[in-house]
Amino acid sequence: MKRIVLFGMALLCIVGMNAQDRFYYSGPQLSIAKNQFTCVSVGKLDGTADLNYQGMECWNEYIVSLQNGGMATTYKYGGMTVAKIGTFKLGSYGDKNTAKVASFSSQFFSREDKMPLLFVSQSHNEAVGGQKDVIFVERISANMKSSKLVAKIQFKEANKLFGNTLQWVVDKENKFLYGFGNTIDDSNASNKHRLVKFKLPTISVKAKGKNIPIINLSEKNLLENYLIEDYCPMFKSMASHGLMVKYGLLYMPVGMGTSSQPSTMYVWNLAKRKLQNAIDMSTSTTGELTDCAECMGELLIQSQDSIYKLRFE
């Protein structure tokens, strides 16, 4: 186990002290008694070989881990262990489904279900049936060994607000839906990052047969629409991965786990529109971080081979 001590400093000032494993970040504490957390791997991922890991989400003690194409693996989390339940294809499985972000809604499809509906971000450069950057709404079975596509959500942009891909995340506490993405792409020097906000759509549970209902969102439905750089010009463009909203904070793991693009956890204050924290994860984790989720009061982060637990103290 590696213990990391965190102290508040100026915005975006992250300094590593290798001898003591200290990292510095700005802003108020993340609802923690001390600016301190421990980081430890709680288990190796056991999904489908040769597929990159993408989205991850948790509900109670259960973890849903996604891979390219829409392969899913479920686990039971035991605090320091992860026990595999099953691996299966999502109902939205396909070569144009990156499954980049997994985010549970606050709505259950049926009282029998153990998990609410799962929102899966397509986040692919190409469209599926004329639809791009859609949200696939999945109903995980009670035994957590299969899933069914029950709806799609599409944002129909009129003014080309986003560039290559768009990621979606649910604010379950306040019932909002956020979209985050590049205006161009990460490799372009003129790229910016846009955040949009909608009321969380309600999914119809009456649809039957093979007709998958499609919910269309338009710019008329926007509650918020702004560029991160308008409020934080120093926001650094790096490869962005998963998203999580908790207590009004948007958690964004970015980077590739390399020296040129170190793994970092950005924490964006949604109400104040400010970068509250930027935490260097490069020595407490290894490789690319793909998504994060709150699980039983702890922050879990998925990499390309393991699940890490960050316990704030």
What would you call each of these model-derived segments?
Residues 27-48, 86-97, 143-164, 205-236, ...:
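Surface-exposed loop and turn segments in beta-propeller and other repeat-based domains
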